[in-house]
Amino acid sequence: MAELGKQHFRTGHTWIASIASLVALVFSGYNFAQAQEDPRTVVTMPLTLRLNRDGEKVSVFVQPTIATRYDTGDVEMVTGMELRLRPPNAGPGPEFFWEDSVRWVATRDPKDYDTIGVWWQFESDPAPFMVTQEEPKQPVMRFSTHGWKDAPGRYDATLTVRRASTREPIERAFCLVMDSADITSLKKPGYDEYRRDVPRRHGGGCYHRYA
């Protein structure tokens, strides 16, 4: 009887040791994967983008969150931001430039005080800025182009962040889906809001127009 109890103990001990080894392996793999990522800077895309057309110029408003991952005490200098958009067809994509940084403000219609609109105001020219863990940045950046060619479909895009500490940029890929109604809406005054969480329209994690 004592031998049977000892057998159960040994079996259980071996099983527990195996589980512990597996857990250690999982954590080791996770830590290795984390080590392969940039140890200092993290860039997170927002839930919302905004598009505006003014004649031949199309602007995309992006507000990423840029912060340092660990409390290293280091200061990161962001030296440049770039936006690339690849159209649904095989043609060349529009060439965007970082026009400026803006801020969103709420305004009331003087003829109807209960009507509130949201518009942007100039905040600053494009320029390098510093990021620390204590002070993450969420700039509203306006990227503009005069080469936008209207075409319905999925646009694959990349936001690139360049830094002073390394030549390796941080790139965040995302996608934007437009149909014919979206293209028509973009030609109207004002801006259109695109979100990644629009009910029944967020397939693939892409941004869809929120109407």
Could you say what each language-model-derived stretch is?
Residues 99-146:
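Extended, solvent-exposed segments with strong compositional bias
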Residues 32-58:
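Low-complexity, acidic Ser/Thr/Pro/Gly-rich terminal tails and inter-domain linkers that flank the onset
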